[in-house]
Structure formats: structure tokens, C-alpha cells
């Protein structure tokens, strides 16, 4: 072999240094770490945006943003897109998925290391495009749903919405490539003796999520491409004057959008299964039922999309079907909730930070699920659609659901990733500040919604002022908690104690706890053999 090949061959056998290690990285651990850092950064930005419009909504009068209501809508749009595509998906699916799936199945790395590299680096230009769009032609004030005619040229002349569309194209491509990589890795690179039904539930959750992404993301890509041609090339997919229909866009968007919310939460389900099993010192209750529940959630999630559209004039039969289908999703979700509770039942439970976040997740996600059952009624949704009741519902499942699972996973695995263990008391303080802050933010929104306050409005009658003030105070507390979390990370990296191979004791029995903390640059060069 010539000199360059030899250099490249040997280059992979020691840890590279400097910026090249990160920019050119094909190592699943480094890429996972970059995903997590990116997600924390994006989460702070998205959180600051939400704080801005919560300050606007703290009292009636529309004074904080100086009556710039387009800016208000741009902040709403950016907050949603950042939190979904640049915070929670990169953290749970990209970050923990990339870092821990190979470790949990005993694989040396991902199946396609270079594909892994571009999956991450596509997110950076996507994020820059989205941020840039806010400064062009007044920004995209469409909401993350991009409904025409508001997102058409009539509603948004200028390049802002086009930039947002390209941003979504890139982040969708990133997710699809990452999904292909993870599916091939899980199917082809498991250690000898590890059958599919011996994999940890986190790996199963990532596998189901990857299939959802591959099936859902291209539909979003198609819908926003049609919107792009409507805006720039004279097509009329969504313009009634040319025989198009704006409701078609809603069908296409939500055919992606509903699986998307399960894409967001399923990896979190997997993390919670690992954490609760570890700190209950018991195997998870109903392992195969848990897998079945995730698969059923993934499947049914694709056939209930129009429950987001109960007020657009669907036929009576469609309303009945989508109401019933949506309610059915509560069954596999209930299986998971009760299996987690059954895992804890009779266990020898300890309550470190990851366990607190997992139990907090179960409580809050259940509240979000109950309001979801209420909203699944098309008759009740006539009243509640596009009110703050809906905002409260999906933030209880995403902001208090998926986010709590991300924190649970972070505190569970941070010692393994960094080699430094955080002081548990700091994590517990973070949990309680977050728990109080997010509940103070979103619980009053149920009352506002039931009283009739619409979503996505910058000003409101004085009757709604009280609960809005409470909600805004909660947002401030939550933002403080997020900054406190960043402090904990830096404090731990500088002053944390060295983390042992297995800081959690006998309950932690998956493969990653057999490695050093942090794991070596290359792991499982000789595959482990799984017994039993």
C-alpha cells in the first residue's frame, strides 16, 4: 500500500487532536458529543425566543415588542422549528442515538462513519439558514406549520419563507441519512449472541424512530418543495385560483407532523426504560410488550394525522375515524406507562437525578396524554382547537415529556461520556427548579384555553391577564433552570470527581457500563460475546 493509505490506515488507531478531530470526525462518540453540544446551544437560543414572546404576553397591550407583531410571529416560528429540529431531535436521536447505540449493541462504530459526519454537519447550515431568514424581508411569520396562503407569496413576499424551506430540507436530509445509518448499524453490527430481542429498549426505540423518520420526512420534503414552486415557479398546488387546495398542504404537512411528535418522544421512552430499570434494580417489566407498544405507536401514528385538522371541514365519517384512531394510541402508551410503574413496583429504588427526571416525565407525560384524549374528541376540539389548551397539551408531552427524558439521559450517561461525575445535589436542584418552572409556565395555559384564548396572538383582552402573568413568570424560572444546567455541565467538567466504569451499581447491566469512563476512542474492536 502506498504512503497515503498507510498514513490513513494508522491514523484511525490513535485519538486525533485539535480541530481536525471534530471537523473531520467519523467517530460515533465524537459525533454524538457534537450533536449534544449543538442541541444544548440551539435549545438555549430557542428558549430565549420563547422568553421574549412570554415577556410580550406577560401583560396585555403588546408593548414589549413595540407592536411589531410580525416579529412576534417570527419568534413563534423560530422557537418551534429550533426546539423540534435543532434541539430535541439532535439531542435524543442524533446525540444519544449515535453515542450509545453502537456501545449498547457491542459494535465498533456506526455502519457508515462518513455518512455520520455529514448527517451532523448538515445541521449547521440548516440552523444558519433559519436564523438568517429572520433578518430577510421581515422573517417567516408563518408558524412552524407553514400553512398557505400565509406562507404563499400573497402572505409572505420576499425570500424569508424560501430560506426556512431550505433549512427544513437540510435538517430533513440530515435526519434521513442518520436514520439509514442507525438502521443498518442495528441490523448488521450487533455483537455475537445479541438477537433483536436481547437489545436494550433504548436501541429498539431508536430503531423504530429511524423507520418513522425515513417514512415521514420525505413527505415533508415534498410538501415544502410544492410550496417552494408555488412561491417561485408559478405552480398552483395550494392556490385555489389555479385549481389547487391549501387544505392539501395541511394533509401533507400533518402526515409528516404527527409521526414527528412520536419521532421526538420515542427515544425518550427508550431512555426512561433504561433509567427506571437501572434504579429499580430490576429488569424492565414486559420487555416484549414494551417493544410491541413502540411499534404500534409508530404504526398508528401514521394514520391519525387529520386530528390536527378537525376544524377545516372534514366529512363526518373522517371525524369519527380520526377521533377513534387517536384515542386508540392511548392504549400502547398506557402499556408503557404501566410497565414503567410495574418495573418500579417491588424494586429496590434509589432516587438520583436521572430517576427524578424519569418519574417527573411519567407524571407530566400522563397529564399531557389525558389532555390529548380530550382533544382527540372532534366535537370538543371544535372549541379547543387553536387555543392555549392545545399549547398546554403538546408542551406537556414535548417540553415536559421529551425534554425531561433528554435530561434523564444526560444525567444518566454524562459520567460515561465525560469521565466526570456531577454532584448529585446540583442535578436534583436543577430538577426541582425545572419542574416548578415548566409547570408554572404550562399548567395555567389549560385554564386560558378553556376560557377561549387563541394561540399565536401577540395581544389579548384583560380578562386573560392573570394566568398569562403566572405563565410568563414560569418561563423566566425555566430559562434560569436551563442556564443553571449549563453551569452544572461546566462545573462538572472542571471540578467533577472521576466517574467509575459503573457509577450506578448492580442495576446498570447494559454493555456501556463494562467500558471505562470515558470509553476509549475505539471500542469493541474485538466484539463482546453476549450470553444468556
Curated annotation (Swiss-Prot):
Membrane topology per the record? Answer: Multi-pass membrane protein
Source domain of life is Bacteria
List ligand-binding residues for heme a3: 393
- Keyword Membrane in record: yes
The alphabetized UniProt keywords are: Cell membrane, Copper, Electron transport, Heme, Iron, Membrane, Metal-binding, Respiratory chain, Translocase, Transmembrane, Transmembrane helix, Transport
Any one of the GO BP annotations: electron transport coupled proton transport
Q: What is its EC number?
A: 7.1.1.9
Q: Which CDD domains match?
A: Cyt_c_Oxidase_I (cd01663)
Family per similarity comment:
Belongs to the heme-copper respiratory oxidase family.
Q: What NCBIfam families does this protein's entry cite? A: CtaD_CoxA
Which protein is depicted? Probable cytochrome c oxidase subunit 1
What is the scientific name of the source organism?
Rickettsia conorii (strain ATCC VR-613 / Malish 7)
Lineage, uppermost ranks? Bacteria, Pseudomonadati, Pseudomonadota, Alphaproteobacteria, Rickettsiales
Amino acid at each position: 500500500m502506498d504512503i497515503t493509505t498507510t498514513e490513513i490506515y494508522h491514523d484511525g488507531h490513535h485519538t486525533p487532536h485539535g480541530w481536525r478531530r471534530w471537523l473531520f470526525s467519523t467517530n460515533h462518540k465524537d459525533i454524538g458529543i457534537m450533536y449534544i453540544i449543538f442541541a444544548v446551544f440551539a435549545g438555549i437560543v430557542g428558549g430565549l425566543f420563547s422568553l421574549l414572546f412570554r415577556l410580550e404576553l406577560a401583560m396585555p397591550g403588546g408593548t414589549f415588542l413595540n407592536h411589531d407583531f410580525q416579529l412576534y410571529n417570527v419568534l413563534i416560528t423560530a422557537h418551534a422549528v429550533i426546539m423540534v429540529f435543532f434541539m430535541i431531535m439532535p439531542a435524543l436521536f442524533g446525540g444519544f442515538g449515535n453515542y450509545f447505540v453502537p456501545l449498547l449493541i457491542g459494535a465498533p462504530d456506526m455502519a457508515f462513519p462518513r455518512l455520520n459526519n455529514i448527517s451532523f454537519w448538515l445541521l449547521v447550515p440548516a440552523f444558519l439558514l433559519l436564523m438568517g431568514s429572520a433578518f430577510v424581508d421581515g422573517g417567516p411569520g408563518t408558524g412552524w406549520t407553514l400553512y398557505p396562503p400565509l406562507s404563499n407569496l400573497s402572505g409572505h413576499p420576499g425570500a424569508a419563507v424560501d430560506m426556512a424551506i431550505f433549512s427544513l430540507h437540510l435538517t430533513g436530509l440530515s435526519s434521513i441519512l442518520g436514520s439509514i445509518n442507525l438502521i443498518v448499524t442495528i441490523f448488521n453490527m450487533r455483537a455475537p449472541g445479541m438477537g433483536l430481542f436481547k437489545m436494550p429498549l433504548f436501541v429498539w426505540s431508536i430503531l423504530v424512530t429511524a423507520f418513522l423518520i425515513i417514512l415521514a420526512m420525505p413527505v415533508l420534503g415534498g410538501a415544502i418543495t410544492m410550496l417552494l414552486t408555488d412561491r417561485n415557479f408559478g405552480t398552483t398546488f395550494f392556490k385555489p385560483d389555479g385549481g389547487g387546495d391549501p387544505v392539501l398542504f395541511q394533509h401533507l404537512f400533518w402526515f409528516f407532523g404527527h409521526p414527528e411528535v412520536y419521532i421526538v418522544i420515542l427515544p425518550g421512552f427508550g431512555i426512561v426504560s433504561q433509567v427506571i430499570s437501572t434504579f429499580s434494580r430490576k429488569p424492565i417489566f414486559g420487555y416484549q410488550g414494551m417493544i410491541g407498544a413502540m411499534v404500534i405507536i409508530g404504526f398508528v401514528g401514521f394514520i391519525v394525522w387529520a386530528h390536527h385538522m378537525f376544524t377545516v371541514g372534514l366529512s363526518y365519517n373522517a371525524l369519527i375515524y380520526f377521533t377513534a384512531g387517536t384515542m386508540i394510541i392511548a392504549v400502547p402508551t398506557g402499556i408503557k406507562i404501566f410497565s414503567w410503574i410495574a418495573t418500579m413496583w417491588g424494586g429496590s429504588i434509589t432516587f438520583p437525578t436521572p430517576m427524578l427526571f424519569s418519574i417527573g416525565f411519567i407524571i407530566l407525560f400522563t397529564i399531557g396524554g389525558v389532555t390529548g384524549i380530550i382533544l382527540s374528541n372532534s366535537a370538543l376540539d371544535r372549541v379547543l382547537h387553536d387555543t392555549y389548551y392545545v399549547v398546554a397539551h403538546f408542551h406537556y408531552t414535548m417540553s415536559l415529556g421529551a425534554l425531561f427524558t433528554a435530561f434523564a439521559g444526560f444525567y444518566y450517561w454524562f459520567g460515561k461520556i465525560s469521565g466526570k461525575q456531577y454532584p448529585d445535589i446540583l442535578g436534583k436542584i436543577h430538577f426541582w427548579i425545572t419542574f416548578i418552572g415548566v409547570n408554572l409556565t404550562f399548567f395555567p395555559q389549560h385554564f386560558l384555553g378553556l376560557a377561549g384564548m387563541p394561540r399565536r396572538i401577540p395581544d389579548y383582552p384583560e380578562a386573560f391577564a392573570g394566568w398569562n402573568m403566572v405563565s410568563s413568570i414560569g418561563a423566566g424560572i425555566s430559562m434560569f433552570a436551563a442556564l443553571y444546567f449549563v453551569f452544572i455541565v461546566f462545573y462538572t467538567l472542571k471540578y467533577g470527581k472521576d466517574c467509575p466504569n459503573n457509577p450506578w451499581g448492580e442495576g446498570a447491566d447494559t454493555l456501556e457500563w463494562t467500558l471505562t469512563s470515558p470509553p476509549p476512542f475505539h471500542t469493541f474492536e474485538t466484539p463482546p460475546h453476549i450470553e444468556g
